[in-house]
Each structure stands twice: as C-alpha cells, then as structure tokens.
Design a protein with these regions (language model features):
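N-terminal intrinsically disordered/low-complexity leader segments
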Residues: 1-28, 211-212
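Residues at secondary-structure transition points
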Residues: 20-24, 28, 70, 74, ...
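Helix-turn-helix
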Residues: 32, 40-74, 78
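Solvent-exposed, amphipathic alpha-helical segments
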Residues: 36-43, 90-93, 97, 175-182
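Hydrophobic/aromatic residues within well-ordered alpha-helical segments
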Residues: 79, 83, 87, 105, ...
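Hydrophobic alpha-helical connector segments
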Residues: 85, 89-129
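Short alpha-helical scaffolding segments that buttress acidic/His motifs in well-ordered protein cores
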Residues: 112-116, 131-135, 172-179
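Hydrophobic/aromatic-rich alpha-helical bundle segments in the mid-to-C-terminal region
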Residues: 124, 142-212
C-alpha cells in the first residue's frame, strides 16, 4: 500500500473490530485484501485462512485491514455476497441462453437447466472448489448465510411464478441442485451424452402438466 493511502487512513482513529467507510484512496487497499483472500482460498482449497496470511499476500498492515473490514468476518461477508452476485450472473446467463435455445419454455426454469449445462463443461477444478470453500464459511453463521438464503428465496420465487403452481418444476430444480452438489465435489456419475439427455428430460418433465 502506498504511503499516501496509509497517511490518509491514519487520519481517523480506528477502533478494533469496527469497520469504517472506505474512502477513495483506500478502495484499492480493500480490493487488494479481497483479491488476496480469494487467491488464497483457491490455492489452499479452504476458506480457513488467517488474517496474517491475508495481510502478507496483500502486502498491507493488519491495522489497515481492520480499518476497512473490522474483522475477518467482515471480509468473509463481502466474499459471500460477491459469490452470490456471481451465482445470479450465472443464472441470468442461463436464462438468456434458454430464451434462444428453448423459446417455448419458461426462462426461469429452462435457465437453470442451461446454467448447469454450462457449469458441467468447466474443466478447471478450482472453479467448483472455490464455491465449496466460500459456502463452507456460512456453516453455523446466520450473518454469512443470510445473503445465500435471500438469493435462493428469490430464485424459487421466480420458479414458482413461472411454473404457475406446477411442483414438477420445483422437483426439477431441486434435482439440478443435486447435480450441482455432485459437481462441486467433482463426482461424475453421468457421461456427457447421458447428462445432456437427462437435462433435456428434466426440462420436459418440469413443463408437462401444470397440476401438482
């Protein structure tokens, strides 16, 4: 971190454990800390990283880190929120693909299918392992799990609205969540052709009778 940024941050007395509003000069420091934490998670394949490790990687002092985030949980909260933003972006991309691939199907449902189809083609193992590590942070922590819960509530609200009461759509999406979980653990139970056929079957299954 530059001496200019350090001097700017020292102008305000910092109480340990209480995050401060980030000024313009400090925004780069904040992003360096977040990126350092992300890179450490990917390398170690665990979110169990110490503040000292993060400070060394980001080349910042612990006081500066606490100035911006207040605590390690302050960093984790933003990491989880950004991961949720990533999930929403993937879902939106899936819905856009579904509009082109499956114009006669509800995008909210078909989009989930296309999202997993794209996800299943990712070869980099750190992609799914990072997601697992981030989600592991939420175990037993109501603050960290809150943005994940809110996002899933919004997803299933869209699924329910699109399916007009057809619970088969919920079953299909829950099945896809199971496939995502297997993918996170890199458990491959279906060959590519079979997987694509199953995904098509799930879409057809979810779109049949609109009765429960």
């Amino acid at each position: 971190m530059s001496s200019t940024v350090e001097a700017e941050e020292k102008k305000t007395e910092v109480k340990r454990g209480r995050p401060r509003t980030t000024n313009v000069l400090g925004s780069n420091t904040k992003e360096k800390v977040l990126e350092s934490y992300r890179s450490l998670i990917k390398e170690r394949r665990t979110a169990d990283v110490s503040l000292d490790d993060i400070c060394r990687r980001a080349n910042v002092k612990k006081g500066s880190l606490l100035y911006h985030f207040g605590s390690k949980e302050g960093i984790q909260k933003i990491i989880v929120e950004r991961y949720v933003d990533h999930l929403e972006a993937c879902y939106q991309a899936g819905m856009q693909a579904a509009k082109e691939q499956w114009p006669d199907h509800a995008p909210a449902i078909a989009g989930f299918v296309e999202w997993f189809r794209t996800y299943s083609q990712v070869k980099d193992p750190t992609y799914s392992e990072y997601g697992l590590a981030v989600l592991s942070l939420t175990a037993g922590n109501e603050t960290l799990i809150a943005p994940v819960n809110r996002w899933y509530e919004s997803v299933f609200a869209r699924i329910r609205a699109a399916s007009e009461g057809n619970r088969k759509a919920l079953v299909a999406v829950l099945a896809l969540e199971g496939l995502f979980l297997l993918g996170h653990f890199r458990v491959k139970v279906l060959a590519s052709d079979e997987l694509n056929a199953v995904l098509d079957d799930l879409l057809v299954f979810s779109d049949k009778s609109r009765t429960a």
